Structures are given as C-alpha cells and as structure tokens.
From Swiss-Prot:
GO cellular component: cytosolic large ribosomal subunit
Similarity remark: Belongs to the bacterial ribosomal protein bL19 family.
Function of the protein: This protein is located at the 30S-50S ribosomal subunit interface and may play a role in the structure and function of the aminoacyl-tRNA binding site.
Gene Ontology MF annotations: structural constituent of ribosome
GO biological process: translation
InterPro entries: Ribosomal_bL19, Ribosomal_bL19_CS, Ribosomal_bL19_sf, Translation_prot_SH3-like_sf
Name assigned to this protein: Large ribosomal subunit protein bL19
Keywords, alphabetical: Ribonucleoprotein, Ribosomal protein
Name of the encoding gene: rplS
Amino acid sequence: MNTLDFLDKKSLRDDIPEFRPGDTLNVHVKVIEGSKERVQVFKGVVIRRQGGGVRETFTVRKVSFGVGVERTFPVHSPNLAQIEVVTRGDVRRAKLYYLRDLRGKAAKIKEKR
C-alpha cells in the first residue's frame, strides 16, 4: 500500500452506497449560511464517476425549469449528509456526456430490472 493511501484511509467514508453512472440519486448536501446549517437535496442522474480514494468525485445532472444543472461532488466529502439511490439505470457507458445534447424523453434512461 502506498504511503498516501495509508494516510488517506482515515478520511474515507464507509456509509456511501454502491452507485454507478446512470443511477438516479438524492444527494443531501449540508449548506452553511452564516451560523445556520441546513440540508439541501439535489436529485439527478449520475453522468460520471472518476478518481479514486479520497479524491474520487461524481457528477450529477438534472434539468431544472428547462435548464440543465450539473453538480460535481467529492464522494468522501463531510458536506454530504447522505446519498440515496432512487433508481438503478441501465446504460452501456461510463461517461454519459451525451445526455447534455438530448431533450425530453430522449434523455430518459432505462431502469435496470
């Protein structure tokens, strides 16, 4: 094991569910405004997952009021309160960048049986 991996192991979270690109997630994000802290839910489709260890990130895409919104989260961030898998998607790619060009029903992902 690499020395950096040994040091990073303490920072890894163990409450992260198994998810892949194509899955629909509810990501509960801690938002700090002044002295108040609240949890905001970001629901969307995972379009990529990259990196490894502490530096692993994933990007979630949703369409809000006709505008595509993408947000990238570090998997092991302390600002993530919870990650829920809503549905499992059936896709053949690891990076779903092609969803950016699709609109309406064409942008839907089949649900895995």
